[in-house]
Amino acid sequence: MRAAWLIKMTCAYYAAISETKVKKRHVDPFMEWTQIITKYLWEQLQKMAEYYRPGPAGSGGCGSTIGPLPHDVEVAIRQWDYTEKLAMFMFQDGMLDRHEFLTWVLECFEKIRPGEDELLKLLLPLLLRYSGEFVQSAYLSRRLAYFCTRRLALQLDGVSSHSSHVISAQSTSTLPTTPAPQPPTSSTPSTPFSDLLMCPQHRPLVFGLSCILQTILLCCPSALVWHYSLTDSRIKTGSPLDHLPIAPSNLPMPEGNSAFTQQVRAKLREIEQQIKERGQAVEVRWSFDKCQEATAGFTIGRVLHTLEVLDSHSFERSDFSNSLDSLCNRIFGLGPSKDGHEISSDDDAVVSLLCEWAVSCKRSGRHRAMVVAKLLEKRQAEIEAERCGESEAADEKGSIASGSLSAPSAPIFQDVLLQFLDTQAPMLTDPRSENERVEFFNLVLLFCELIRHDVFSHNMYTCTLISRGDLAFGAPGPRPPSPFDDPADDAEHKEAEGSSSSKLEDPGLSESMDIDPSSSVLFEDMEKPDFSLFSPTMPCEGKGSPSPEKPDVEKEVKPPPKEKIEGTLGILYDQPRHVQYATHFPIPQEESCSHECNQRLVVLFGVGKQRDDARHAIKKITKDILKVLNRKGTAETDQLAPIVPLNPGDLTFLGGEDGQKRRRNRPEAFPTAEDIFAKFQHLSHYDQHQVTAQVSRNVLEQITSFALGMSYHLPLVQHVQFIFDLMEYSLSISGLIDFAIQLLNELSVVEAELLLKSSDLVGSYTTSLCLCIVAVLRHYHACLILNQDQMAQVFEGLCGVVKHGMNRSDGSSAERCILAYLYDLYTSCSHLKNKFGELFSDFCSKVKNTIYCNVEPSESNMRWAPEFMIDTLENPAAHTFTYTGLGKSLSENPANRYSFVCNALMHVCVGHHDPDRVNDIAILCAELTGYCKSLSAEWLGVLKALCCSSNNGTCGFNDLLCNVDVSDLSFHDSLATFVAILIARQCLLLEDLIRCAAIPSLLNAACSEQDSEPGARLTCRILLHLFKTPQLNPCQSDGNKPTVGIRSSCDRHLLAASQNRIVDGAVFAVLKAVFVLGDAELKGSGFTVTGGTEELPEEEGGGGSGGRRQGGRNISVETASLDVYAKYVLRSICQQEWVGERCLKSLCEDSNDLQDPVLSSAQAQRLMQLICYPHRLLDNEDGENPQRQRIKRILQNLDQWTMRQSSLELQLMIKQTPNNEMNSLLENIAKATIEVFQQSAETGSSSGSTASNMPSSSKTKPVLSSLERSGVWLVAPLIAKLPTSVQGHVLKAAGEELEKGQHLGSSSRKERDRQKQKSMSLLSQQPFLSLVLTCLKGQDEQREGLLTSLYSQVHQIVNNWRDDQYLDDCKPKQLMHEALKLRLNLVGGMFDTVQRSTQQTTEWAMLLLEIIISGTVDMQSNNELFTTVLDMLSVLINGTLAADMSSISQGSMEENKRAYMNLAKKLQKELGERQSDSLEKVRQLLPLPKQTRDVITCEPQGSLIDTKGNKIAGFDSIFKKEGLQVSTKQKISPWDLFEGLKPSAPLSWGWFGTVRVDRRVARGEEQQRLLLYHTHLRPRPRAYYLEPLPLPPEDEEPPAPTLLEPEKKAPEPPKTDKPGAAPPSTEERKKKSTKGKKRSQPATKTEDYGMGPGRSGPYGVTVPPDLLHHPNPGSITHLNYRQGSIGLYTQNQPLPAGGPRVDPYRPVRLPMQKLPTRPTYPGVLPTTMTGVMGLEPSSYKTSVYRQQQPAVPQGQRLRQQLQAKIQSQGMLGQSSVHQMTPSSSYGLQTSQGYTPYVSHVGLQQHTGPAGTMVPPSYSSQPYQSTHPSTNPTLVDPTRHLQQRPSGYVHQQAPTYGHGLTSTQRFSHQTLQQTPMISTMTPMSAQGVQAGVRSTAILPEQQQQQQQQQQQQQQQQQQQQQQQQQQYHIRQQQQQQILRQQQQQQQQQQQQQQQQQQQQQQQQQQHQQQQQQQAAPPQPQPQSQPQFQRQGLQQTQQQQQTAALVRQLQQQLSNTQPQPSTNIFGRY
């Protein structure tokens, strides 16, 4: 403390000197002394570090500390300790720059090298001491946290090598036994530190670093939030916690696992979670909802990206850039290199989307399930490899899967897939919904593939269902309907099931599901109503391929069920979803899956008879099928000559009508194909897979047996085709492909065996069977291409079948199809090109030239021979002939070709349209075309002639046209079927037909050419048939409505393959031509229609693509007018899945396909709508602004499946808009976008806020809710696909809308409130935020405007809040917070723009601060929003700070440093003195401010401030009580305060309500002057009384001559400005003898007595060190003259007599507030001073004596003088010392009705916390004081009042009691230091005795006291004797002087007596104080005299001798009064 005082005085001295210089240099003492202290500390630290640093030999400080320290190190440590304590004192006193000092402390630690644990351990307490200061700065806390986390991580890294260190430490240290038992309890939560805590070396380090880190976490979490920094290397991107391997809450704590520790850990975990959320928010720039783990917007973006990748991928080909690997990389990224969090959140959404994509009817293709299974299998393998190590990455998938299944761990995606089944998977609820059925079948197929690829575990699925109770079962038997829905069902699904769930209680349902005991004849008795859905499975001996399943049975099944599709699933509709899934999901029929099969059987059927019956049902249907396959008469090589393999007629199973009749007449014991299929489709998919697996195995065995020569039986091609159909129907796609490839591999051996047996089937059987195989493989080409090995097998097998015909130009249609497929395989798969290039490359071009060459139509008109081949055409199946010869004759004879073509067409068009016959004729023609290539041109020509029949014979084939009426609608279907089969068999190219026949015909009709309409109608019918893919069942049972369609599924598949090969241009040509025809206004149409143009197509809209319903439309649609029919055909074509998919994919790649001069802009847009939304009505163009309505409709109907369509529509609109209308269009798009958001907000769905809460990780909710998959969430991604000009307009409109919502007036008017809430709810939507942020990308010119707009909006919100506009209701306040959050999120999205500009940074920082200051957002009302604002502010501040730390140029460093300081100053100024929890968090972001002392000032009660800012009295002040009121708070620098000195600069009397009054000479003063010896008055200047007496200089042996010096100089008034120049008095010579001894005694010895300069006195009062050594003790002589010349009186108080000699009353000071808290040091009691008197600077040194005097009342003082006199004569009685008790008349007389101004605020700087209440015990300390206890005064310990020449009347104010408390700065530390300010120590408001005070003492007296305190009582007695002897000697000398000058002698003698008594009194007081420090306080008088007059004093001292009293009074009267210089005031 003394050192700090000296530093302060030195600083002030040099500052004063520099003021006098001409060139003034202002030095900041804070920074200057911070640098001095830190520099010195650093030097000492370097010396210590050198010692503790491990030496080259590796001997660290550990070993070296055992020996004695080197001297220089010991000195350095001592210096370090002292200087560090001094720094701590100065830091707490506010004398240092706190920020700089803490930064230096931090840098010291950062410079400690990793190995220097000794040094770290030595310095760690320093860090802990300042930890409470560090957490007040987030910047410093962040750096400190980085240091702690890195050190802790280093300690953990070294744990492995730590054991040896523990041993060595224990061997060298004596400590190991004590800490060893403690770590187990303290480190239980954190096992990684267990070893470290066992080590005495590391234990304190771990605890210390952990403590600091946890302190930062609790007190300054902002320092640990993830941050990004653009430049600064020290403010790194990330969080300090990134470096810590465990959470801070798991770090060790010393208290073990106590309840308190657990409580702290819980709080730590809570804050950790908040830090995580805040960090994620900063990472995404607060752009999305931070509460959700999977942010909706981000996840939606990922999902849409995945969908876009899937849509753009071509699954028909495989090459490097379009393979499954590339698809997987585009969807999941390049391998699992992302962190686990991303895998869990984003991958879940992607996996769910893949499942949806595979299941949804919004996309098409059976390949989707296999693609998803393959993708997930690859992804799973990647993650497995990542987890198990790269060594397992190359393992087989089976090993990985079996490993994962053998262990209890599920496959990676099991949970996600189960969640998908719980929430999003389709289920059967509505029997009328076709889409629902399709999606359910797709789901079964998907999970069939997932189970096959080990991505989904059926076993674990079943176990989960059982554990959850989803498959509750009771008694054995079929499972009854579940009485409850699946608890995991999603809410929306529960709503959908509402209707069915009510039926679940119906007992009849469970009865209807029972299996009849006689189920052995289940399939023979089809009339029974209880045909169970849960068909039994085969026992596990069946090892088939996996099987998807199909919903089941109708209650009343007729033999040919008419409503098959609806009926098969009847019972399932009432079942919970998981019952449906468990029933149908197939399980692979392998040995490893036997457990799952048995488990499924038991779960569904129990273990009794019903399970056996279920098994038996499967066996029965399998037996029936095998009976058909193995019946006699099947293809035996010696009996099959009369059978045409492709058209068996009698044995067909493909639904011929005649065949049906014949079969019904046969005995029922032998099943028909229809019966088998009817039974088959009633099975579940699981059972269907089992059946087909066994049957296909049987067929394969037959063929293998024949190939090996062991059998003569071959299965018929039709039988194989039938099995193909069954497998396809059961969705056993993988099994179907495997079966086909196995058959294909056997075909070459079968062909060789047929040759060996010389069978007639040579060359036909294998090619016919191969054609069926090719048809299947072509149909599932996208599935086949996923497996390269299978592709290679297929290619080799096909080459083996047709190798003999590769070089022939002719061949059967089957061979043509096989060659064409080989060509397609080769060109679509780069893998095959690489493998078979040499073999097939030459042949490839030949195939292209023969099969895929364009053909021109023939226009021949030859002589027609009506009888040519008429018999063959009438019954093709009954005739056998060789195609080769017939083909050759047709090739050579054009007339025969012409006749054959005309006759064939005549039979097709004019016959009775038997479907089978049409099919047979078409196949015959196809076979002949294979052998006669020229027929292709004829077919094309004749079709052109028919379609363009209006061309008047220019197309040829006039004979046919004369006999066929093209307008006859009855043959259109037959002709269309005929053409379709020709195209399927590669006789015609679909493109050629479109180019040559269809387009000309349609355009002719569109141009209204005469008679063109019938041909155009025929063209439409053919095109419709060619573009549609009718999916007929294997057995056509709809006998009542015969339709002409393609009978063989083989041909249907081949036709579909032809559709896939067509180029995109041809498809668009057809669509445009039909559209133009439908739009044309046709003249003379012979057809009328009653319905509207859009109604007819709607009939088809809901009907799906079933071709069998075509007959029902012949009346309603085909007889309509041509334009209506054309529209119907166009819509029907567009409704074909493959057409829509091809068009959309093509348009996405090149949107110019619809840019055609034939189409107008509106037509192109309508055609686009038809392509995009074929099942929806076209837009109505009516209404206002139809363009905007259309755009709005596009945006409103958005969902994830229609993103492509919406984007294409808008892009087409933009492309077709001319430049002059572009602005209008862009504005319409922008406004429509905003309207969509407004409507979304108004609907109450509040999709923004709702959706943000939806995607939780709960198992019961989907990864993305339906709200997020559609509507406004998708607007932003859609706009992002459009040109940037659109985004700019949308951004502008959004900004305008934001501004509309900012004027949120008070909610007084309902309409205004509604508008406000509407706007607010719109603007609070997260999707809207996403939209604006999306548009901002690349829109820099818009960013500035939007930022400015947002700034004004946020400002408006804050202003509205200030105006209390949100306090009326909670709802507006909530909306305001949402709107504010939205705007801040928008700003966050543009934060890089804000940070680029210093001005914008400052503006936004101030605004963000204003948000918090105004209370708009605080921690209590909305903590999430508060942390957003806080983190934004933190990023802005740190971003400014960061730049100056970076490695950029010096100039810009300074500039950025300046910018940072300016910003910090502005924020600090704005913060001001405001106090709240929220603002404390903000203060942490700013640099630590310099500490100041606060002084509270007063003003008269009722003061007002006028318009000019001047204070005036209030109007009603006359009637108000007089007094003072608190006015302002003044800040004073700690460097301006000097203990023991009263500088005039900082403090002003006016601050304390004093009023200047003129001093009146009191009557008592006049009377006293009359008592003077002189006959005249000798007034002297007041300065005379401030000077010490001119005493002679002090010598060792005072010579006699010097005694006259005081007399010589006595009359001279000493100069006021040189108090030290006065000669020493004789009093000094008295003390000479003791002084010599005292000088040699060390000052520190007196500390034992508690009165040394470094300690406080016994009552908490310390001696200021600056006064202990004062050079001039001469002021002792003025002891008697205490009356000050200034009188300060309270208002209305009667002034006491005595005038100028009354003691000056000390003015009241207002208390200070918010002083920095300091710990209470021992021996220092908080007290309250009773008065402060100011000193003139010139009077400083003369005041010393009074500061040294123990404060006693004047009466006592007189008594002491008497005692001193008597003692010298041996007359002193000790009993008289304590006799006097002041009478009550000394009490202060205050005016009635006024309460004294009392304050209990402890105002000292250092002795205790600011505002400490004074303990009441202080009021009873047994020391008397002249100050009245009734009116204690407030004192400011940090300022001194300047004394003015004239007195101030102190205005008395009401009681103003302060009870301010604050916490200590360091609760863990108590410095054994004394406060700096001693004389200003506040004392009790109850009137602490002045005698308690240990006042300032002269150096001689100080030494005297030190000696007295040091020695024992005997030495003290000796001292007293010596002092008495000296007193007698000096008294004699003084008497000689007095005899020479009597007046001077009396004065000197009185002073000597007074001094002697003072010494004795001090001695007694010290003894009493030592005795009373522990003694209880005694009551003290309640009143003491404030003003004492000498006359009055005489009457009060009645116990004294009258003579002595008169003598003293005479001496006093001889001396003029002088001002009091005791800064304690009068005692």
Swiss-Prot record:
One of its GO terms (cellular component) is mediator complex. The modification Phosphoserine is found at S482, S512, S545, S547, S1105, S1116. Residues 1241-1258, 1815-1830, 1965-1975, 1983-1999, 2008-2021 have a biased composition (Low complexity). The keyword Metal-binding does not apply. One of its GO terms (molecular function) is transcription coactivator activity. Residues 1631-1640 have a biased composition (Basic residues). InterPro entries: Mediator_comp_sub12, Mediator_Med12_catenin-bd, Mediator_Med12_LCEWAV. Residues 1463-1901 are annotated as: Interaction with CTNNB1 and GLI3. The modification Phosphotyrosine is found at Y13. Keywords: Acetylation, Activator, Methylation, Nucleus, Phosphoprotein, Repressor, Transcription, Transcription regulation. Residues 549-563, 1297-1316, 1605-1618 have a biased composition (Basic and acidic residues). Residues 170-191, 474-516, 538-563, 1088-1113, 1241-1262, 1297-1321, 1585-1676, 1805-1848, 1965-1999, 2008-2027 are annotated as: Disordered. The modification N6-acetyllysine is found at K1645. The modification Asymmetric dimethylarginine is found at R1746, R1844, R1865. Belongs to the Mediator complex subunit 12 family. Component of the Mediator complex, which is composed of MED1, MED4, MED6, MED7, MED8, MED9, MED10, MED11, MED12, MED13, MED13L, MED14, MED15, MED16, MED17, MED18, MED19, MED20, MED21, MED22, MED23, MED24, MED25, MED26, MED27, MED29, MED30, MED31, CCNC, CDK8 and CDC2L6/CDK11. The MED12, MED13, CCNC and CDK8 subunits form a distinct module termed the CDK8 module. Mediator containing the CDK8 module is less active than Mediator lacking this module in supporting transcriptional activation. Component of the Mediator complex, a coactivator involved in the regulated transcription of nearly all RNA polymerase II-dependent genes. Mediator functions as a bridge to convey information from gene-specific regulatory proteins to the basal RNA polymerase II transcription machinery. Mediator is recruited to promoters by direct interactions with regulatory proteins and serves as a scaffold for the assembly of a functional preinitiation complex with RNA polymerase II and the general transcription factors. This is Mediator of RNA polymerase II transcription subunit 12. It comes from Pan troglodytes (Chimpanzee).
